[in-house]
Amino acid sequence: MRWQLHSPRRYAGAHSSMSNCPPPMSQVIIKTPAQLDLMRRAGQLLAQVFADLDSFIRPGVTTMQINDRAEAFIVNTLKARPASKGQYGFPYSLNTSVDHVVCHGIPKVDEVLKEGSIINVDITLEQGGYIADSSKMYGIGAISDEARRLVDTTYDALWKGIEQVRPGATLGDIGHAVQAHAEAAGYSVVREYCGHGIGQQMHEGPEVLHIGQRGMGMKLKPGMVFTIEPMINQGKRGTREMKDGWTVITRDHSLSAQWEHTVAVTEQGFEVLTLREEER
């Protein structure tokens, strides 16, 4: 679940204007090995939620049914808590963003998934006092080659960013890698929303932009944990928030895709705490 720049509302971070300068190091909470163990456990549980949804998400299912199934699985099977529910007044357990919805899509009882659509499912889970955050794209039935290329390019851009993570690298290295990969494919990077530090709170420092310059911004240190979650548009990068105060769409109604993982900086490089079985 991403952190919003510009606005103090909803998912906003502590900063009211977009900047290439992340929060100072004092706002970043370095996790101990014991805390990382708890976050790793939360991430493993979250991966199980997506595994449960993999065979459930298909044409004819409503986005509210996705919400209800995930919530039941988190609470009843995993004995954990859907961390998004109640956060900033959000009433549901996850976000469902279909086609030209960039992020923060609200589950609806009358939103039926149709053949050829794409959907991002964004879930947070808390157990043991620590939160994990991840999102995954699903193609509904057979999707177009154009939609598949966008989804795959966005996934690759996520990993280009993750692969930059190591002690001494900078946040700008991550943003540059994501941006360069997406723009080389002819796509645009959404700039109003970003990744964020995470731990006992859903949104901690630093802000992790998906654009940037190599060598710029905060240097990474072991024990930092944050999300990388690029939102990539097929058309122009402009977005617009809908009247419901949550849903964000592309201004030109082009398709948008997004993938997310929670990543820890280790002494050797990085660890993806929310890695799913098919990614191992």
Regions found by a protein language model. Give the residues of each.
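Active-site neighborhoods and metal-handling regions in enzymes and metal-associated proteins
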Residues: W3-Y11, H15, S19-R280
